[in-house]
Amino acid sequence: LREIANERHDIACSIGHSGAVLRAENLALLKYLGLKTRSLEELEFSRFDRLSMVDAQPGAGNVAFDASLRLDVVIDHHPIRPATRSARFTDIRSRYGATSTILYEYLKAARIDIPTPVATAMVYGIRSDTQDLGRESTRADLEAFLDLYPLANARALGRIVQAPLPRNYFSKLRIALDQAKVYGSRIVSFLGRLESPEMIAEAADLLLRAEDVRWTMTLGVVDDWLHVSLRTIDRDRHAGRIARNLAGRRGFGGGHQALAAAQIPLTTGNNSDRQIRIRVKDLTKRFLRATGNPKETGKRLCS
């Protein structure tokens, strides 16, 4: 989006992000692009003439954005949220597998020559969001990938995808595996308290690869929020709807058919370890009820 603003209208742009950037692949991507991004808390929004939100929406639990600010542009591939409708311009394509695909079509329509770093970043975005075009992808995602890949830096892309992982990554992974319980064709794992939510989603992806498993739910606590990730290969049920139900009225939840997330606030009275375990147990029961047999006994994945 900044490429269009710069190339077509000579408009200077600042890029902000919500939360900390901790995932190894994202850090490697920022390093390759040489991007200097700032957290939303550091930005003085009154200095800007226009505000755009990309690959996210206002009102989502993973976006710390001042609700009193009106957005000019929202572009995303997740199902539309009520707060998004107040933006001056919205382009929400929930059938698309990646927001990078939407932005590629903008660049193509504007007849802008896509620089190698931008092409590399967009290829990574499509690969990451669709798991190499194997999940929630469309013909548009495939066409964008095929057009962008020849323009990308394959060696840099490899360094991003295979970015070195910090040792604490494996400590968190061990917890996810140790805590994983199998309920028939479903796996549930509570990772405890974490610094950031990235591992919760990564664990859900990994556990879904277990033999004979069709659903995974992983949970973890970050600050005063209980984060939930859902993954499935079951075409008969919709992960996004289940996530919304799990989140309830006080939380945030939603997503696609095959992957979804929920964020549930923990107030002062219910954020003790005991209260969190009770909440996780309740969410597990509701998840099992929504995805099949709720009375199935859990067995450890790793004996």
Segments predicted by a language model, with ranges:
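Short alpha-helices
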Residues: 77-146, 281
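Short, structured coil segments at secondary-structure junctions
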Residues: 33, 68-70, 85-87
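Hydrophobic/aromatic beta-strand patches that form the interior of the parallel beta-sheet core
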Residues: 16, 52, 71-75, 90-92, ...
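A short, gly/pro- and small-residue-rich
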Residues: 54-56, 64-81
